[in-house]
Amino acid sequence: CETAEYFTKIAKELFDIDVPYRQVQFFNLQKSFDLNDEQYEALMKAGHLPENLLNYEETPGASEAINKWVDQGHEVFIITGRPFNSYEPSRQWLDEHHLERVPLFCVDKYGRETAKQDYRYNMTLAELYNMTFDFAVEDSPAAFEHVMHFDNCRTAVFDRPWNSRAELPNDRFVRCKDWQEIDRLFENREITK
Protein backbone atom coordinates (compact mmCIF):
# COMPACT_ATOMS: atom_id res chain seq x y z
CA CYS A 1 0.00 0.00 0.00
CA GLU A 2 0.97 3.62 -0.19
CA THR A 3 2.13 3.97 3.42
CA ALA A 4 4.70 6.72 2.87
CA GLU A 5 2.12 8.88 1.12
CA TYR A 6 0.01 8.81 4.28
CA PHE A 7 2.97 9.44 6.57
CA THR A 8 3.61 12.71 4.69
CA LYS A 9 0.02 13.75 5.47
CA ILE A 10 0.33 12.70 9.12
CA ALA A 11 3.60 14.68 9.50
CA LYS A 12 1.80 17.73 8.11
CA GLU A 13 -1.19 17.27 10.46
CA LEU A 14 0.86 16.58 13.60
CA PHE A 15 3.85 18.88 13.17
CA ASP A 16 3.06 21.16 10.21
CA ILE A 17 6.01 19.58 8.41
CA ASP A 18 5.36 19.66 4.69
CA VAL A 19 7.53 17.19 2.81
CA PRO A 20 5.88 16.14 -0.46
CA TYR A 21 5.94 12.40 -1.13
CA ARG A 22 8.36 12.75 -4.06
CA GLN A 23 10.82 14.47 -1.70
CA VAL A 24 10.92 11.69 0.91
CA GLN A 25 14.61 10.92 0.51
CA PHE A 26 15.12 8.31 3.23
CA PHE A 27 13.25 5.20 4.33
CA ASN A 28 14.02 6.45 7.84
CA LEU A 29 11.14 8.90 8.22
CA GLN A 30 12.74 10.52 11.25
CA LYS A 31 15.52 11.65 8.94
CA SER A 32 13.21 12.47 5.99
CA PHE A 33 11.01 14.72 8.13
CA ASP A 34 13.81 15.96 10.43
CA LEU A 35 11.96 14.82 13.56
CA ASN A 36 13.22 14.56 17.11
CA ASP A 37 12.77 11.23 18.91
CA GLU A 38 9.49 12.25 20.54
CA GLN A 39 8.00 13.45 17.25
CA TYR A 40 9.14 10.31 15.46
CA GLU A 41 7.51 8.11 18.08
CA ALA A 42 4.25 10.08 17.76
CA LEU A 43 4.40 9.82 13.95
CA MET A 44 4.94 6.06 14.02
CA LYS A 45 2.18 5.56 16.57
CA ALA A 46 -0.29 7.64 14.52
CA GLY A 47 0.70 6.00 11.25
CA HIS A 48 0.03 2.53 12.62
CA LEU A 49 -3.32 3.27 14.27
CA PRO A 50 -5.98 0.96 12.83
CA GLU A 51 -8.09 3.85 11.54
CA ASN A 52 -5.10 5.14 9.58
CA LEU A 53 -3.80 1.78 8.35
CA LEU A 54 -7.21 0.83 7.04
CA ASN A 55 -7.37 4.00 4.92
CA TYR A 56 -4.08 3.52 3.07
CA GLU A 57 -4.55 3.24 -0.67
CA GLU A 58 -3.50 0.15 -2.54
CA THR A 59 -0.52 0.45 -4.84
CA PRO A 60 -1.95 0.03 -8.36
CA GLY A 61 -1.57 -3.48 -9.73
CA ALA A 62 -0.29 -5.07 -6.52
CA SER A 63 -3.23 -7.28 -5.56
CA GLU A 64 -3.77 -8.37 -9.16
CA ALA A 65 -0.16 -9.51 -9.56
CA ILE A 66 -0.02 -11.24 -6.18
CA ASN A 67 -3.33 -13.04 -6.75
CA LYS A 68 -2.12 -14.15 -10.18
CA TRP A 69 0.94 -15.73 -8.55
CA VAL A 70 -1.25 -17.49 -5.96
CA ASP A 71 -3.59 -18.69 -8.73
CA GLN A 72 -0.56 -20.14 -10.55
CA GLY A 73 0.25 -22.19 -7.44
CA HIS A 74 3.12 -20.12 -6.07
CA GLU A 75 3.54 -19.88 -2.31
CA VAL A 76 3.39 -16.17 -1.46
CA PHE A 77 4.00 -14.46 1.89
CA ILE A 78 3.76 -10.82 2.85
CA ILE A 79 6.53 -10.02 5.30
CA THR A 80 6.54 -6.55 6.79
CA GLY A 81 8.65 -4.59 9.22
CA ARG A 82 5.55 -2.98 10.67
CA PRO A 83 5.17 -3.10 14.46
CA PHE A 84 3.82 -6.39 15.77
CA ASN A 85 0.73 -4.65 17.18
CA SER A 86 -0.27 -3.51 13.68
CA TYR A 87 -0.91 -7.09 12.54
CA GLU A 88 -4.71 -7.12 12.96
CA PRO A 89 -5.48 -3.93 10.98
CA SER A 90 -2.85 -4.89 8.38
CA ARG A 91 -4.47 -8.31 8.00
CA GLN A 92 -7.89 -6.66 7.69
CA TRP A 93 -6.53 -4.26 5.05
CA LEU A 94 -5.12 -7.16 3.03
CA ASP A 95 -8.41 -9.07 3.29
CA GLU A 96 -10.36 -6.01 2.13
CA HIS A 97 -8.02 -5.76 -0.88
CA HIS A 98 -8.60 -9.38 -1.93
CA LEU A 99 -5.36 -10.77 -0.47
CA GLU A 100 -6.98 -13.02 2.12
CA ARG A 101 -5.13 -16.07 0.74
CA VAL A 102 -1.71 -14.59 1.47
CA PRO A 103 -0.17 -15.11 4.93
CA LEU A 104 1.16 -11.99 6.66
CA PHE A 105 4.12 -11.95 9.02
CA CYS A 106 5.56 -9.07 11.02
CA VAL A 107 9.33 -9.26 11.42
CA ASP A 108 11.37 -6.99 13.65
CA LYS A 109 13.61 -6.02 10.71
CA TYR A 110 14.74 -2.76 12.25
CA GLY A 111 15.13 -3.62 15.96
CA ARG A 112 12.13 -1.52 17.03
CA GLU A 113 10.26 -4.13 19.06
CA THR A 114 10.98 -3.82 22.77
CA ALA A 115 9.07 -6.79 24.15
CA LYS A 116 9.04 -10.45 23.13
CA GLN A 117 5.66 -11.37 21.71
CA ASP A 118 4.86 -14.95 20.84
CA TYR A 119 2.09 -14.43 18.34
CA ARG A 120 2.02 -16.89 15.45
CA TYR A 121 2.31 -14.07 12.92
CA ASN A 122 5.48 -12.52 14.42
CA MET A 123 8.93 -13.79 13.62
CA THR A 124 12.49 -12.97 14.46
CA LEU A 125 15.11 -12.34 11.82
CA ALA A 126 16.58 -15.76 12.63
CA GLU A 127 13.22 -17.38 11.87
CA LEU A 128 12.95 -15.39 8.65
CA TYR A 129 16.45 -16.47 7.60
CA ASN A 130 15.42 -20.12 8.03
CA MET A 131 12.84 -19.70 5.27
CA THR A 132 13.55 -20.07 1.55
CA PHE A 133 12.55 -17.59 -1.15
CA ASP A 134 13.26 -17.35 -4.86
CA PHE A 135 11.64 -13.93 -5.32
CA ALA A 136 11.14 -10.85 -3.15
CA VAL A 137 9.72 -7.36 -3.55
CA GLU A 138 11.41 -4.70 -1.43
CA ASP A 139 11.49 -0.91 -1.29
CA SER A 140 13.68 -0.33 1.76
CA PRO A 141 17.43 -0.08 1.24
CA ALA A 142 17.76 -0.89 4.96
CA ALA A 143 16.17 -4.30 4.27
CA PHE A 144 18.41 -5.25 1.34
CA GLU A 145 20.81 -6.92 3.77
CA HIS A 146 18.01 -9.21 4.95
CA VAL A 147 17.13 -10.29 1.42
CA MET A 148 20.81 -11.05 0.78
CA HIS A 149 20.45 -14.03 3.14
CA PHE A 150 18.41 -15.90 0.53
CA ASP A 151 20.59 -17.54 -2.09
CA ASN A 152 19.35 -17.22 -5.66
CA CYS A 153 16.52 -14.89 -4.66
CA ARG A 154 15.69 -12.41 -7.40
CA THR A 155 14.58 -9.13 -5.81
CA ALA A 156 12.34 -6.52 -7.38
CA VAL A 157 13.28 -3.16 -5.89
CA PHE A 158 10.09 -1.15 -6.11
CA ASP A 159 11.33 2.25 -7.25
CA ARG A 160 10.47 4.86 -4.64
CA PRO A 161 11.88 8.32 -3.88
CA TRP A 162 13.72 7.03 -0.79
CA ASN A 163 15.53 4.27 -2.68
CA SER A 164 16.15 5.96 -6.03
CA ARG A 165 19.76 6.76 -5.16
CA ALA A 166 20.47 3.51 -3.33
CA GLU A 167 23.10 1.30 -4.83
CA LEU A 168 21.71 -2.16 -5.51
CA PRO A 169 23.78 -4.89 -3.82
CA ASN A 170 24.19 -7.12 -6.87
CA ASP A 171 22.54 -8.19 -10.13
CA ARG A 172 19.88 -10.21 -8.29
CA PHE A 173 18.34 -6.83 -7.37
CA VAL A 174 16.40 -5.20 -10.21
CA ARG A 175 14.72 -1.81 -10.00
CA CYS A 176 11.05 -1.86 -11.11
CA LYS A 177 8.87 1.22 -11.59
CA ASP A 178 5.48 -0.46 -11.03
CA TRP A 179 3.72 -3.76 -10.38
CA GLN A 180 3.57 -4.57 -14.09
CA GLU A 181 7.38 -4.53 -14.19
CA ILE A 182 7.53 -6.50 -10.93
CA ASP A 183 5.25 -9.14 -12.44
CA ARG A 184 7.39 -9.37 -15.60
CA LEU A 185 10.50 -9.82 -13.47
CA PHE A 186 8.69 -12.52 -11.46
CA GLU A 187 7.85 -14.39 -14.65
CA ASN A 188 11.54 -14.27 -15.63
CA ARG A 189 13.01 -14.66 -12.14
CA GLU A 190 15.47 -17.48 -12.81
CA ILE A 191 18.98 -16.33 -12.03
CA THR A 192 21.64 -17.51 -14.41
CA LYS A 193 24.75 -18.70 -12.65
Stretches found by the model and what they are:
Residues 1-42:
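Active-site neighborhood of HAD-like aspartate-dependent phosphohydrolases
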Residues 49-77, 84-91:
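Short, acidic loop-to-helix structural element flanking the phosphoryl-transfer center
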Residues 75-76, 101, 153-155:
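Hydrophobic anchor at the start of a short beta-strand
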Residues 79, 107, 158-160:
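Generic beta-sheet signal
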Residues 84-137, 141-148:
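Substrate-recognition "cap/lid" segment bordering the active-site pocket of phosphatases
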Residues 96-108, 131-132, 168-191:
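Structural recognition of alpha->loop->beta junctions
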Residues 135-177:
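Acidic, Mg2+-coordinating phosphoryl-transfer loop and its flanking beta/alpha structural elements
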